Swiss-Prot record:
Gene Ontology biological process terms, A to Z: adaptive immune response; antibacterial humoral response; antibody-dependent cellular cytotoxicity; B cell receptor signaling pathway; complement activation, classical pathway; complement-dependent cytotoxicity
Pfam families the record matches: C1-set (PF07654)
Record's protein name: Immunoglobulin heavy constant gamma 1
A GO cellular component annotation in the UniProt record: extracellular exosome
Chain intervals for the UniProt region annotation (CH2): 111-223
Ranges where the record places region Hinge: 99-110
InterPro entries, per database record: Ig-like_dom (IPR007110), Ig-like_dom_sf (IPR036179), Ig-like_fold (IPR013783), Ig/MHC_CS (IPR003006), Ig_C1-set (IPR003597), Immune_Resp_Modulators (IPR050380)
Cytoplasmic side: 372-399
Domain of life: Eukaryota
Listed SMART domains: IGc1
């Protein structure tokens, strides 16, 4: 098959089915060749809760794959989720907005609002990554993305405002041509850590000849009193210790807002084989999440120290760390468990041998008794047959 760019389809639940704690948004990447294709969410800003499935070769000789991200249901009305697809062999880049369907065929819905301009450019505004806003050594950025810019009107103008005051330090990247003969244009505004954490509002204003009026998008940190996360580490389950790999768990709860970063390390080196759930809204208005690190059982049993690092604005210095290792108490417990298992195995072996010997003894005794009784019975019968004639002779002589 010749080189072919993918078709991208957003996969989203209806708004009626997202009433639970989380919602799954998906992206189907179909009919491309050759491998590979890369899928990210919100231009890489969203990594938690993302799972991209392996590509599947279809009978047509073309590949397909899907990517799913799990997000809090409460965020669907306030945050934008974009599936970014990049197929380098065909020089194809596609951005698809994924959002719940607002109308349902089986229900009467009010008229859906008209888009800003049917077939014209669309604008999306993304917040900085939580880790970037919490570490002074990193640079937080607010990103404004314009898609579906036509060849006829390729020029896009960006104006940025912080709390209503225009700023001029944003950088606009070269426009990128998409598979559908449109352009994608990105402007990035570097922000101050404290400005973002203090709740300043950022506005991106986009002007283009294809638009009847400029499009404005605003974004800021979630409002509300920050709440400090509580961090707990959990060792592997005893049942899991029979396997070659074990799971170390980090529970982070009671935090607000949901912007948080969780990482793992061991002996000062980062650990990459971990998965972190998206923040889940709890009944008290705070959020919680779980992070699971998978390691070889041998590393755990050797006493290596594993640390769960959490970054959140409500923490002192925005950072805390909880460590976990095979402590003497846990080691003793595991040893006792193994010893108990060994003792039980030995006990069952002893019981089995005892029962076997007992049954053999009973069978032997029964057999011996049977032959003894048979011999005695035969002797008595023979003796009786010998005595009876003599007794009759004696009676005859007496008469």
């Amino acid at each position: 098959a010749s080189t072919k760019g993918p078709s991208v389809f957003p996969l989203a639940p209806s708004s009626k089915s997202t009433s639970g704690g989380t919602a799954a948004l998906g992206c189907l990447v179909k009919d491309y060749f050759p491998e590979p294709v890369t899928v990210s969410w919100n231009s890489g800003a969203l990594t938690s809760g993302v799972h991209t499935f392996p590509a599947v070769l279809q009978s047509s000789g073309l590949y397909s794959l899907s990517s799913v991200v799990t997000v809090p249901s409460s965020s669907l009305g306030t945050q934008t989720y974009i599936c970014n697809v990049n197929h380098k062999p065909s020089n194809t880049k596609v951005d698809k907005k994924v959002e719940p369907k607002s109308c349902d065929k089986t229900h009467t819905c009010p008229p859906c609002p008209a888009p800003e301009l049917l077939g014209g450019p669309s604008v999306f505004l993304f917040p900085p990554k939580p880790k970037d806003t919490l570490m002074i050594s990193r640079t937080p950025e607010v990103t404004c993305v314009v898609v579906d810019v036509s060849h006829e009107d390729p020029e896009v103008k960006f104006n940025w405002y912080v709390d209503g005051v225009e700023v001029h330090n944003a950088k606009t990247k070269p426009r990128e041509e998409q598979y559908n003969s449109t352009y994608r244009v990105v402007s990035v505004l570097t922000v101050l850590h404290q400005d973002w954490l203090n709740g300043k509002e950022y506005k991106c204003k986009v002007s283009n000849k294809a638009l009847p009026a400029p499009i404005e998008k605003t974004i800021s940190k979630a409002k509300g009193q920050p709440r400090e996360p509580q961090v707990y580490t959990l060792p592997p389950s005893r049942d899991e210790l029979t396997k070659n790999q074990v799971s170390l768990t980090c529970l982070v709860k009671g935090f607000y807002p949901s912007d948080i970063a969780v990482e793992w390390e061991s002996n000062g080196q980062p650990e990459n084989n971990y998965k972190t759930t998206p923040p889940v809204l709890d009944s008290d208005g705070s959020f919680f999440l779980y992070s699971k690190l998978t390691v070889d059982k041998s590393r755990w049993q050797q006493g290596n120290v594993f640390s769960c690092s959490v970054m959140h604005e409500a923490l002192h210095n925005h950072y805390t760390q909880k460590s976990l290792s095979l402590s003497p108490e846990l080691q003793l417990e595991e040893s006792c468990a193994e010893a108990q298992d060994g003792e039980l195995d030995g006990l069952w072996t002893t019981i089995t041998i005892f029962i076997t010997l007992f049954l053999l003894s009973v069978c032997y005794s029964a057999t011996v008794t049977f032959f003894k009784v048979k011999w005695i019975f035969s002797s008595v019968v023979d003796l009786k047959q010998t005595i009876i004639p003599d007794y009759r002779n004696m009676i005859g002589q007496g008469a």
